[in-house]
């Protein structure tokens, strides 16, 4: 049975869900946050120690300004209302990406990370303003600046995800089959599960089924 320490998720389909139900992309983003809470609980119950959520990519800035502003306000409200619950559940928040938003959101994110830094039930990595190509380029620049040897270990240790094991599982909802510039280095040997359901429809049972499927896989990492 394959152990699971790290699951990464591309939470795709919020906007399409909102259009389908109420002709509002924003509604889909709001419902998607409810799904996030449920999935975190399943991860904790299955003793998964790391969960990385692709929340906002560097490419998402191309979306309509009002939608981007709503996404930020939604995240602000979530942190204000839920930080005590996250702390009580011993959830550690870790930010990966370039945290360069408005002053209020920047402060909330940094304070939330600081407040939960000693929690140990699960580490939830929020990928915000994140792009994997930029992450890899920045890692190479750090190695050159530090005059370190250029090798796999040093490159890994200069990524946002240093000291975090590579994901065993990647889930992408929304019936789209691509990586979208997410954890390109870290996903080298990850098992990928593409789900037809839009993110707000993805539920606890769906997640548990993927966990079960993964545990039954024979993984050989290129060997026989």
Region annotations inferred by a language model:
Residues 1-224:
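Flexible, compositionally biased loop and terminal segments
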């Amino acid at each position: 049975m394959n152990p699971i320490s790290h699951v990464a998720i591309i939470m795709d389909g919020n906007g399409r869900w909102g259009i389908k139900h109420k002709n509002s992309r924003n509604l889909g983003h709001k419902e998607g946050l409810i799904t996030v809470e449920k999935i975190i609980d399943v991860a904790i119950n299955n003793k998964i120690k790391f969960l990385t959520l692709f929340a906002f990519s560097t490419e998402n800035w191309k979306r309509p300004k009002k939608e981007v502003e709503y996404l930020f306000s939604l995240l602000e409200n979530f942190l204000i209302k839920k930080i005590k619950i996250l702390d009580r559940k011993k959830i550690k928040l870790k930010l990966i990406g370039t945290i360069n938003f408005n002053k209020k959101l920047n402060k909330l994110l940094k304070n939330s990370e600081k407040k939960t830094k000693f929690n140990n039930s699960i580490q939830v990595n929020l990928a915000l303003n994140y792009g994997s190509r930029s992450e890899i380029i920045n890692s190479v620049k750090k190695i050159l600046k530090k005059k370190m040897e250029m090798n796999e270990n040093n490159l890994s240790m200069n990524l946002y995800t240093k000291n975090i094991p590579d994901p065993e599982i990647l889930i992408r909802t929304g019936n789209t089959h691509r990586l979208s510039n997410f954890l390109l280095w870290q996903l080298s040997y990850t098992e990928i599960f593409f789900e037809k359901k839009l993110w707000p429809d993805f539920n606890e049972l769906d997640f548990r089924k993927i966990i079960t499927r993964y545990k039954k896989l024979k993984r050989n990492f290129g060997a026989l």
